[in-house]
């Protein structure tokens, strides 16, 4: 069975966790074998149609593509992500807005795309609830499959990082530079306590002003041993080694679903400091350290506490790519009408 993985955005125009997940899903499925091969979607390639499509997220511009897939007689699977939509009130409001667009404004769009899917995948239980409430997806069509983490992060060594940048301890933050991820607040708090911060990630195209503010803060942090690497890719050994070498990992996002960078840090058994945003209610993050505020003085205190007394974390093996690939294979076979192996 051939499976085509459709990323959220073209790889050449956008970077981020979902693009990484699309690439890694292909690699993991091809490594698994067992009658399934995977490829990334290409707008220009002319080949026989695959047996099934898997859309990793569903931005509006991909809705038309789901219609074409359906017309071609191929099933598709959707991964739905809802980010900060949590709580009964917010879910009901989102469901009402969706109903108005679909039924009063005659703009069914995403609603039809979701209902036409052979299966819906969510990466958290909260997103499974959101899919049911907002889109009316029956629980039997929803499959909970978490993000996968490359097994290299479980056994990483600091040696590559030490050879390139020395063995001084540092705070690590990985992710595309954007306001919702809070890198500026983190850099300013590190500067207040003179803690070296290593930022890994590019500035998103529409976040130039925020990127300039982060650059100014990191210029100050460089006096304390910090640095910013903008072009490190997920498959780079230096990224794995940075996780192994850091004193602890920090991500102060106000909105996420299940951030891959945090899971990579947990796989490396590193202490993690998060801003207590709604997504952190997930049981996966229950044992981590938190800052309750991004107010500079109190946030800096949280940094200092973890720096002085780091507490290691861990990640369960069910988040490894082989395990995720096996679960996806079962979903794909069922969607194509094939009975999975028992």
Where are these regions (language model features)?
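Short hydrophobic beta-strand element within catalytic cores of glycosyltransferases
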Residues: 271-274
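Conserved donor-binding/catalytic core segment of Leloir-type glycosyltransferases
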Residues: 163-181, 187-194, 198-200
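A charged, aromatic-enriched C-terminal amphipathic alpha-helix characteristic of glycosyltransferases
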Residues: 17-20, 156, 308-340
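Membrane-proximal helix-turn-helix segments that form the acceptor-binding/catalytic region
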Residues: 99-120
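Conserved acidic donor-binding segment of nucleotide-sugar-dependent glycosyltransferases
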Residues: 288-297, 304-308
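Nucleotide-activated donor-binding/catalytic signature segment of Leloir-type glycosyltransferases, i.e.
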Residues: 211-234
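Aromatic "clamp/platform" in nucleotide-sugar-dependent glycosyltransferases that forms part
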Residues: 254
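Acidic anion/phosphate-binding donor-loop and adjacent secondary structure
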Residues: 132, 148-163, 168
